[in-house]
Design a protein with these regions (language model features):
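Positively charged n-region of N-terminal signal peptides that target proteins for export
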Residues: 1-4
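N-terminal signal peptide c-region/cleavage motif recognized by signal peptidases
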Residues: 14-16
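Start-of-domain marker
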Residues: 20-81
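Beta-strand-rich domain onsets/edges
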Residues: 20-36, 121-187, 192-201, 209-213, ...
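Glycine-centered loop-to-beta-strand initiation motif
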Residues: 76-79, 87, 219-237
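Short acidic/polar inter-strand loop motif in beta-rich domains
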Residues: 97-109, 247-253
Length: 269
């Protein structure tokens, strides 16, 4: 049965309550008509957009590999794009941005600086971040670049070989086509950055709820020394897969670029 993502009810509480994560997803992962819609936004709950996307440049790859810019129209809670689907096969959507991530050193700990409005924060010793209000001109600070990709796939009529996207900051290789996922069939994703295996990358999987009161499904793992990560998805439904650079020790000054890729997937059977 076809299921529109935004008709589903979700109740998963995000791990990071101080920020909304970006995502992009089709209105349906399997389409039949000549046009479909793609949604993007910032959300705390999987697929539950609260703020329209901003800061990202989006591109569409059609089944033949042709790439074109994908403009999105914003309303307050979400952004939407119209996609012509005249060809059969798999379409890829990718949004990209580059941002500065600021860290500050306090009590010999390098902590990420977050612009949070929360005035009832836990003591600093119990947090892994620092607020803008706690930083002053005498506080040692450093910035690194973070490269964000948001990616999704949908197919018309049939799935087709994924077009290699040379623009992706984090290269992804799938053991199973993203639109052909099946229950209890392991999904192996090969991760690479600039041609080198992305080892020890953090991977978190969140499942969209289908009904009120449904238990949260959250999986966490890391990529191995060859950049492979194995995901065992045991329930049908829509998933957000977040892949990010390894964490650095708080006493170590951040110097390297960091990467985050957020993928929207669906398992229908």
């Amino acid at each position: 049965m076809k299921k529109a993502l935004f008709a589903l009810v979700v109740s998963f509480v995000s791990v990071n309550s101080f920020s909304h994560a970006p995502f992009v997803a089709p209105s349906n992962f399997i389409v039949a008509g000549g046009h479909t819609a793609v949604f993007a936004g910032f959300a705390e709950l999987p697929f539950d957009s609260e703020v329209a996307i901003r800061g990202f440049e989006f591109s569409l790859f059609n089944p033949n590999g042709a790439k074109k810019a994908l403009p999105l129209t914003n309303i307050k809670a979400v952004s939407v794009a119209d996609v012509e689907t005249s060809q059969e096969g798999t379409y890829q959507v990718i949004g990209q941005r580059k941002a500065d991530i600021k860290y500050a050193n306090l009590d010999q700990r390098w902590l990420r600086v977050l612009d949070t409005k929360d005035t009832k924060l836990k003591p600093l010793s119990e947090r892994d971040f620092i607020s803008e209000l706690e930083v002053n001109e005498k506080t040692p600070q450093v910035s690194v670049k973070r490269f964000d990709d948001v990616i999704t796939y949908f197919s018309k009529g049939k799935s087709s070989k994924l077009v290699k996207n040379s623009d992706a900051n984090l290269t992804l290789g799938y053991s199973v086509h993203p639109n052909e996922l099946k229950k209890n069939q392991p999904l192996i994703i090969d991760l690479a950055v600039k041609g080198k295996a992305a080892k020890n990358f953090n991977v978190e999987v969140e499942k969209q709820h289908k009904s009120l009161g449904e238990q949260d499904v959250v999986m966490k793992t890391i990529s191995n020394h060859t950049g492979k990560v194995i995901l065992n998805l045991s329930e049908t439904g829509a998933y957000i897969v977040t892949i990010s650079s390894p964490n650095t020790a708080e006493k170590v000054k951040p110097i390297a670029d960091v990467y985050r890729t957020i993928i929207s997937l669906n398992m229908s059977e």
